Regions:
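Short S/T/G/P-rich N-terminal loop/turn motif that feeds into the first structured element of a domain
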Residues: 1-189, 193-218
Length: 218
């Protein structure tokens, strides 16, 4: 399976129009059997953008379904006559192609808040980072009330990157879970053992997300 992470940056003042645009798109994605994990906005940090994740079996399926979606008269009417009648609403689009790691669960959204985390591994350390997550981290996240939604690597290029998503009932629950996780002796031991030859992670990026009203449930 391929997972496509897409972020749309709205033109100034156009975020409401972008939501309208994507709410219509969500219905047409379903019509054309384009799987969607969810639609999100930033809970903390950058505003004015919406992110969603497509799911498809392979790139051939993507090409066929996206072509059918783009040719749908209902979509053309929505773009030409409705959301963009007063100008372009999207300033920039970013997308990343991802594939699940062997230890990832099948992604499901069951909680109110999601956290998108990107770890750039130290050179040559990505296999060790995968081992730590598969052997220790996922289990300890669950122990401390964090939902393991999905774990991915990038499809193209020579990326040294691990991407994953966690879920929480609320922002307060997120704070509590991370606090107890960081002080867990099992985690401290696992981290120390995995880093005895040096740190595994060079940089970490985090986004706190909340599903939109039109995001699929469950």
């Amino acid at each position: 399976m391929i997972y496509e992470w897409r972020t749309y940056e709205a033109m100034p003042g156009k975020l409401p129009a972008l939501h309208t645009h994507l709410e219509v798109a969500a219905g047409l994605f379903k019509k054309h059997e384009l799987g969607v994990l969810g639609f999100w906005t930033e809970e903390i940090g950058i505003g004015g953008q919406v992110t969603y994740m497509w799911i498809y079996a392979d790139f051939e399926e993507r090409q066929k379904k996206v072509a059918a979606f783009g040719a749908d008269p209902a979509w053309k009417q929505q773009v030409a006559e409705e959301t963009e009648k007063e100008g372009v609403i999207v300033a920039r689009t970013h997308n990343t192609m991802l594939q699940l790691t062997p230890y990832s669960p099948v992604p499901r959204l069951k909680m109110n808040v999601q956290e998108w985390r990107i770890y750039d591994a130290m050179p040559g350390k990505l296999p060790d980072l995968h081992t730590r997550f598969a052997t220790h981290t996922l289990r300890l996240f669950e122990k401390h009330g964090m939902a393991n939604i999905g774990y991915w690597t990038e499809v193209f290029g020579t990326s040294n990157r691990l991407v994953y998503m966690l879920g929480y009932p609320s922002l307060g629950d997120r704070e509590k879970s991370w606090a107890t996780f960081q002080t867990d002796r099992d985690w401290q031991q696992a981290r120390a053992e995995s880093e005895k030859n040096g740190p595994l992670v060079a940089k970490t990026y985090t986004r706190i997300l909340r599903p939109t009203a039109y995001s699929p449930k469950g």
